[in-house]
């Protein structure tokens, strides 16, 4: 693992320690895993591919509806909350319990993104 990927993984682990986020990963817009703090029972390749696909669809929907640049995509399931937040050429995907406080999670995710941007340069 590269030094940058290791630093990003540390940021993701910190996000999970300091918030209700239970899993997180940084994925390229092309669907490649850049850094992961996903649990071992989660298929990283599938998550990376689906994250890229969801981000692409979200951007197309935003464009079609003329709603501006996509900020984040939130999927609310019965058991989990999934938040995708795009950086310039990557997407941070985070999972949390369905009853988690979305405002606080959003705040913590944005703080992690600021740190990741510093690592990526």
Region spans (language model):
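Acidic, low-complexity cytosolic segments
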Residues: 1-23, 30-121
